[in-house]
Amino acid sequence: MSTASPLHHGHGNGSYANSPAPTGVTGRDAGVAAAAVADSAVRSGSVPASASGSAPGSASGSMYGEAHTQHHTGHHHYSAHHTHSHGALTSPVNGGHSSSWSPYGYPAAPVYGGSPSPYGHNAYSQYASGYGYANGTAHHVATAPTTPSATSTAYHTGVNGMMMHHGQHAGYGYSSHHLGSHTPTHTHTHSSAYFMNGDGAHSHLNSSAHLTSPSYTTAPQYSTQLPLAGRHRVTTTLWEDEGTLCFQVDARGVCVARRHDNNMINGTKLLNVCGMSRGKRDGILKNEKERIVVKVGAMHLKGVWISFARAKQLAEQNGIADALYPLFEPNIQSFLYHPDNYPRTAAVIAAAQERQAQRQRAPGGQPSPGANGTSQAPPLMRANTTPSNGDTSTFSSGLSSLGSWTGSHDQGHASAPTTAQPSPSSMHNGATQMHMSLSNHGTASPTYAQSQQQQQQQQQQQQQQQQQQQQQQQQAYPMTAAQQLARPSVGDRRQSAPISLNNSVGHAENPYGATNLGGAANGGLVNGARKVSGLKRSWNDADDLNGSAAASPTERDMQRSGSGGSNGLKLDGDDLHSPDSSDDRLAKKTRGMPQRGGGATTAMPSMSTNMLMGVGNGSGIHHE
């Protein structure tokens, strides 16, 4: 019975080499005979083992010519959709070059010879199993049919020699669109040496089947011990505002973050995991003694951050500690160092440490958000600038530690690690050297008592030095007549708050100082500041004409005026200390108006708080 093959009538690859066997000969004998003929042809040197030419015992043809006819005239006994191929049938997926593959899936030494194939010896056959294309090329590229080699009878229909047969049937994905799901062609291979049933091992060419070929020799294959459901979900993010790294664990659709520097955990997201209501959650977090409120930044970083011990206690009480594993592990960094994502993790941690080192090299530390809040805990500074010679531990993989430990606030866990300034020798490969001091230590809680005291002392010393420099500077330059007019009298001084950096003239952090105002001259007497009081305020113009002509303003004078200058704003009680006359008032309005109107009207910060107070208009109008 001669019928057409279901394999799309010759649109395959032309790699079928079906030898017409004489009638009356069984399929097994025909296959053995064809294999013997091919073997003798290869050994005699007439035909190379992997060439694409014709050999005795194999009917070859072009793609649309003889191959198409061959499917009609060849001896295909099509009974119960089984096609018995009597010749040596090379693998259509492997492109016919099945001789270069050993029985165990690893490529053997290829036999190079004269190949009339347009792509040379075994050009695209290595991609056949991975992508499902026959011969790895387009379906209209005519590749000449090939000759079976001496070893091709062992596995005719193997995908790169890696047929994984389940029982007798082996399936592999044939995703070329010329072989539809309607062509379940069963080809009987004969004299198979490596299959269990060498007499007739069935191989299904179904497009629905799928085969994972383990025949890769270069690409690494990691066999994870844990199933997909049990794999760790630890990710990292760089919190640029805080200059630290955060470890994140996703549980029930909520991302819970843990800081790297002090191990504090986002309590808001933590309680969201257990499905707690907003009122109950906020009530619990409001009563926390040690907390930091973050209101700006990324969504998964906003919320109330609480200490590690308290977060672990809340997680255990609500039964979500297991769901958040490994968030509460002391050495959570060890879960990041998988060979797949090791370079990226190394780069992120190195960037975090470089940023933290830059913050330490910057003069003075700025407090983190929430440090000046109403919490009872000591404020957490953004960068701890006083690293001590604590114990530094290295990770088990030999990565050098760049961190140092500060403080000794021990509540069953170690103190907070802060990175020191790395030396050039230790930062030459910053992508691989990381801060691994959490590996052999417990969790950390922030302690900043010593550093806070030292910073307060430094600020006081700086304030005293600035006061002395200001007085010396103002004594060195005598006051002009205009400054004497704008200067108040040394009369009743109401305020006695200590001077701070906000009103230090010429300080780098003072945006209203003399260094930043071009209109100010000789010591930075800023025109426009006024005295703030809850009493009734009025203008006293006599002070501007009859004020004292001292060479330099005193400290109380600067406290009253805000920056050593005044526009004549006084209290009503000050009228007793200086004469007042209508002539002086008229003279003031005629002479002082242009000078005061041209002065800079700048909002000055108050002495007690950082809120901006009012601005003097300098118009001389009487305010009641």
Swiss-Prot record:
Mutant phenotype after disruption: Leads to filamentous growth and abolishes mating and gall induction. In culture, produces abundant thick-walled, highly pigmented cells resembling teliospores which are normally produced only in planta.
InterPro entries (UniProt xref): EFG1/Phd1/StuA (IPR029790), HTH_APSES_sf (IPR036887), KilA/APSES_HTH (IPR018004), Tscrpt_reg_HTH_APSES-type (IPR003163)
Example of a GO MF term: sequence-specific DNA binding
Pfam families: KilA-N
Gly residues composition bias: residue spans: 615-624
Extent of Polar residues compositional bias: 369-391, 427-451
Primary localization class, coarse: nucleus
Residue ranges: DNA binding: 267-288
SUPFAM superfamilies noted in UniProt: DNA-binding domain of Mlu1-box binding protein MBP1
BP-aspect Gene Ontology terms: conidium formation; positive regulation of transcription by RNA polymerase II; sporulation resulting in formation of a cellular spore
Residue stretches of biased makeup (Basic and acidic residues): 571-587
Occurrences of domain HTH APSES-type (ranges): 233-339
Calcium among keywords: no
Residue stretches of biased makeup (Basic residues): 70-85
Region of interest: Disordered: 1-24, 43-99, 352-456, 474-504, 538-624
GO cellular component entries: nucleus
Alphabetic keyword roster: Conidiation, DNA-binding, Nucleus, Phosphoprotein, Sporulation, Transcription, Transcription regulation
Subcellular location: Nucleus
Ranges of Low complexity composition bias in the record: 43-62, 352-362, 392-426
Keyword match Cell division: no
PTMs per UniProt: Phosphorylated but is not a target of cAMP signaling.
PROSITE patterns: HTH_APSES
Family designation: Belongs to the EFG1/PHD1/stuA family.
Function summary: Transcription factor that regulates asexual reproduction. Binds the StuA-response elements (StRE) with the consensus sequence 5'-(A/T)CGCG(T/A)N(A/C)-3' at the promoters of target genes. Regulates dimorphism, virulence, and the sporulation program. Required for mating, gall induction, and sporogenesis in maize tissue. Regulates expression of the filament-down-regulated gene UM00205 and the teliospore-specific gene ssp1.
UniProt protein name: Cell pattern formation-associated protein ust1
Origin species: Mycosarcoma maydis (Corn smut fungus)
Gene: ust1
